[in-house]
Amino acid sequence: MKKIQLGQSDLHVTPICLGTMTFGEQVDEATAFDILDRSLERGVNFIDTAEMYAVPPRAETFNATEKIIGNWLSQRPGARQKLVMATKVAGPSRNMPWIRGGSPDLTAKDILEACEGSLRRLKIDVIDLYQIHWPVRSVPAFGGVYYQPASGSEGTSIHAQLEALQLLVQAGKVRAIGLSNETPYGVHEFVRLAEQYGLPRVATVQNGYSLLNRSVENALDETLHRLNVSLLAYSPLSFGLLTGKYDVTGLTGPGTSPEARLTKFESSRKQRWGRPAALAAARRYSALAREHGLT
């Protein structure tokens, strides 16, 4: 499988990345091991996780995914050398009090401590790509549309966060840095400050992108192109809506698999993917695909 360079970093990854947010919730450890083994056998060299996972987030499964991956790596001698390992530090708690005691900020100290925790759980010496999971700033992320300047505190500055990330890079604990759920403004500021002050340059932005989520095309695409920052597109199948498995039954109707994510978790149905318009659009895309002999 060919490799793609991430931004201006020295990381080269396969076009397919294994996302792991279900490990520790829908997917138990034994099944997760099978998935990881299969992925490695098929040539995928890129694994992404986060300290917040498993999803849907709750206190009982906080950090669970990293622990499972760490157990797998410790039992697979030689696997680590073949892989690009990416994880994320959680942003402000945002109604998740188990994250740093409900802090509304992500300080430099928080970043340093979170990195140590991820290294320990993953049982590795260096994180190849370390990402900020969502901004400290109030932004329309996770299905939001409109920017609300009056909501939320600005918190720790981007400059201070970059300085903390620089310490991790200099210590050999992180190779490259990235962002997630970011805006064009945020990406531009991270790159501008990095270039102005000689700090680590963002290599990637991990945002949702699919037929049902085209927000990347609202100026973020140009920003990434001009600044040479790579997009890591998450939820390409829109939480399973684009697989067609909900087309006939709906999200909770008779015949729906009880283990299907949007059926099993009410919290997921209350978010962007559970909106009636999302299912209606997915059904129309499925019909269009069938008309053209596509799956």
List each language-model region with its residue ranges:
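Active-site gating/metal-coordination segments in enzymes
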Residues: 95-131, 208
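Short, acidic/polar
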Residues: 27-39, 107-121, 158, 162, ...
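Beta/alpha (TIM)-barrel catalytic core signal, keyed to glycine-rich beta->alpha loops juxtaposed to Asp/Glu
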Residues: 135-295
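N-terminal binding-site loop/beta-alpha segment at the start of enzyme catalytic domains
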Residues: 1-88, 112, 125, 164, ...
